[in-house]
UniProtKB/Swiss-Prot annotation:
It comes from Rattus norvegicus. It is found in: Nucleus; Cytoplasm, Cytosol. The keyword Acetylation applies. GO terms for cellular component: cytoplasm; cytosol; nucleus; UFD1-NPL4 complex; VCP-NPL4-UFD1 AAA ATPase complex. GO terms for biological process: cellular response to misfolded protein; ERAD pathway; negative regulation of RIG-I signaling pathway; negative regulation of type I interferon production; proteasome-mediated ubiquitin-dependent protein catabolic process; retrograde protein transport, ER to cytosol; ubiquitin-dependent protein catabolic process. Gene3D superfamilies: 3.10.330.10, Ubiquitin fusion degradation protein UFD1, N-terminal domain. Keywords: Acetylation, Cytoplasm, Nucleus, Phosphoprotein, Ubl conjugation pathway. Belongs to the UFD1 family. This is Ubiquitin recognition factor in ER-associated degradation protein 1. Pathway: Protein degradation; proteasomal ubiquitin-dependent pathway. The modification N-acetylmethionine is found at M1.
């Protein structure tokens, strides 16, 4: 049995309601047309020829249409969705990042097969540059960018556009399978540390020995001049007794306090230094204490006393 290919493009083959064919792939920048199709580069969908739509419509294909792309020369594969069926026959257009994952060059052959994927529940990404940390809300940015994608494959490096800058993210993990659909799904997203990111080094704090003396080398020395430390002058020339100011505390006189070993994190305790009042009992002295109205009285007119 001999088979002849009478057309310039391969004929799609159908096995058990499955679409499978080969196309020559090109990047979206080579798509002919007056309109700018840079929006295709921002997502994970491809552009296929109209004949593919004719074949898919005859099959019992579940929606959304998802495809597995395989480069047999490099044994690399990925998954994608379809955006439009306007490409030339025998040609499909892929985003540039997808061609890099498949190690495809312009005009290379790629195997396209229809597949059914499970809905994603979890995915983990690793930014390929520390610049991704400059984004204020990375989860919101990623959620907005993934609206242009149909599925995710573990190991792929996807590209998202934010603030006129391209950020690359590697898909580290997907659940419940290595290839999942992200259309109308509730998916938990997690991030790994960016590639080449180094945590800032924290200064090492050396523990001071409790028994050793404290280092007071950082204390400021005694100042020679102090404002308002002299004696004042009065207008009448008299001198007023001024109590001498207390001598400043020397660093050597400072003693360490006892730490509170019962301290609990998040509990604030207000400690009041209440001093008990000392009751002073004064002893009564017979000759030295003054008692009011204790003397003898005197009268202006002397009266005789009756016997």
């Amino acid at each position: 049995m001999f088979s002849f290919n009478m057309f310039d493009h391969p004929i799609p083959r159908v096995f058990q309601n499955r679409f499978s064919t080969q196309y020559r792939c090109f990047s979206v920048s080579m798509l002919a047309g007056p309109n700018d199709r840079s929006d295709v580069e921002k997502g994970g969908k491809i552009i296929m020829p109209p004949s593919a739509l004719d074949q898919l419509s005859r099959l019992n294909i579940t929606y959304p249409m998802l495809f597995k792309l395989t480069n047999k020369n490099s044994d690399r594969m990925t998954h994608c969705g379809v955006l439009e069926f306007v490409a030339d026959e025998g040609i499909c257009y892929l985003p540039h990042w997808m061609m890099q994952n498949l190690l495809l060059e312009e005009g290379g052959l790629v195997q396209v097969e229809s597949v059914n994927l499970q809905v994603a529940t979890y995915s983990k990404f690793q930014p390929q540059s520390p610049d991704f940390l400059d984004i204020t809300n990375p989860k919101a940015v990623l959620e907005n960018a993934l609206r242009n994608f149909a599925c995710l494959t573990t190991g792929d490096v996807i590209a998202i556009n934010y603030n006129e800058k391209i950020y690359e993210l590697r898909v580290m993990e997907t659940k419940p399978d290595k290839a999942v659909s992200i259309i109308e799904c509730d998916m938990n997203v997690d991030f790994d540390a960016p590639l080449g990111y180094k945590e800032p080094e924290r200064p090492v704090q050396h523990e001071e020995s409790i028994e050793g003396e404290a280092d007071h080398s950082g204390y400021a020395g005694e100042v020679g001049f102090r404002a308002f430390s002299g004696s004042g002058n009065r207008l009448d020339g008299k001198k007023k007794g001024v109590e001498p100011s207390p001598s400043p505390i020397k660093p050597g006189d400072i003693k360490r306090g006892i730490p509170n070993y019962e301290f609990k994190l998040g509990k604030i305790t207000f400690i009041r230094n209440s001093r008990p009042m000392v009751k002073k009992v004064e002893e009564d002295e017979a000759g030295g204490r003054f008692v009011a109205f204790s003397g003898e009285g005197q009268s202006l007119r002397k009266k005789g006393r009756k016997p």
